[in-house]
């Protein structure tokens, strides 16, 4: 057994490596022998660095594996590998170069090499024309920095590494600069380097002359944080209880269609207020970390105006500028005439340009700056000579612009656009109704009387503020309900109200049974609607200044404010239906769905339908019955062989010669039947 090849340690490095890891001291001599062998191979390699050297490759990996066992003997080993790579990385054979890098990565994972020295070497190696090597180094850099900050953020090390990354971003080699940018973006997305310093360095990539670096920087700011998801399940118990109380209150009366409609409207208002109450989450926090967004957007616009990049890159720059202007509410008046030039129905990617126009609008922009943009959209898109889809997109874009800058809409243009509510195209009709619904909330007085819908207490209070006007209130709106509730409690000590099946019941109303304080609050709010507005403001101011409000008080105020949106205004009955809109809550950013929303899917032409049908037939099997085998890889059965065998080989077979044939009588009957059948069909 002693003569077996795998027990010869000098030539069997894996076995020696295994034994050394178990007992390093016992195999020191064998290790030193291999180390001397490695040094001699290095000398040979220096004379022919471009040749493949399998022995050197195996020895390097062996020493990297056992490096932690002999720290003194291998103290110069990492530096020696680093020098070899720095001096010969351009002429090294690709596999040997990869082996050297993997050995250094292994030593770094064992904390035998400092990250700063290794980072400088690896960024130097990124200049090599070796895609696999670049991918390996990129993965290691990201993973290594992640591991450094695994337990806690190592600010001292991060500062050193960040400064090195920032210098590499300005490197003359585009490959090294691009990978340094990719590393910073990846580390930001992993919440490792998510500080303002990193974000502001990435902004410099948006002015790079290298298109790939420019696009990577733009994509970073146009992305979205993955963690910011709308999760309706994360609502608080208070909000859930309010909805349950609302359901209980409206279900205690008769089950009439009138009660059902009131319940649906109340639930819509409740959902709307919940979304308003939620803590604001930013769609992408990187845009908020930019130190000087005004200067950044001005430089981007200047670069865009003189840019010779592809149209797709220009669109990305326009999107980023519009987001900066909209989110930070910047003054960039030259951007609107620039966008206005592209607002034509035949323009390529016109919906994205309309999105930019809407996103860059906000309430601090003077109305006379936005008004030409709206008129251009109306004149070029919302005309009868265009198709229904084009008109729909135009009205949707105008609606989104006006929602952010209401003063830019003139009353005459609004009257013209609302006339499309009776258009023959369903999509145009729904878009016009959406615009009407928007102005019912913003300023109903701008609509014609028949378009204002059923007035509510909330719509009576709605008005558009003048440009630059701020509404500073010295009271909490809705606080008067607390004073009214106090007076009600004094009158009715027991807190119960008699529920009688009287006129209200016959009229189809529900019975007011008190299940919680929310019901009391809603009824008190309904009574307060008959009080003059000035008196209510005075009561609210008195309550706001004379007592400390608790969480329960704020909840009562919130319920009362919601009741204003559900109930009719005093003396007003229901004359016509409200326009139901399926609008989503407007967030910080717009999406293309808001511009391209079509309520009715357009008909496909014949070519599109045929292509869809043919695409669905690719994986379909033939309409023939195939006797499948239990095992598809099994051999052919004897029955199948007999069926497929050549007849000339089978004619002298006993089975063929003794085969039973039809008798003369059977042939007569078959002939008679066939003749009768032919006669029958004549």
From Swiss-Prot:
Disordered: region residues: 226-248, 485-545, 564-587, 601-682
Coiled coil: 254-319
Primary location recorded for the protein, binned into one broad class: nucleus
UniProt cross-references to SUPFAM superfamilies, sorted A to Z: ARM repeat
Localization, UniProt: Nucleus, Nucleolus
Compositional bias (Acidic residues): 228-240, 486-509
Any single GO BP term: ribosomal large subunit biogenesis
UniProt entry keywords in alphabetical sequence: Coiled coil, Nucleus, Protein transport, Ribosome biogenesis, Transport
PANTHER family to which the protein is assigned, alphabetical: HSDA/SDA1-RELATED (PTHR12730), PROTEIN SDA1 HOMOLOG (PTHR12730:SF0)
Family of the protein in this entry: Belongs to the SDA1 family.
Cited function: Required for 60S pre-ribosomal subunits export to the cytoplasm.
Entry protein name: Protein SDA1 homolog
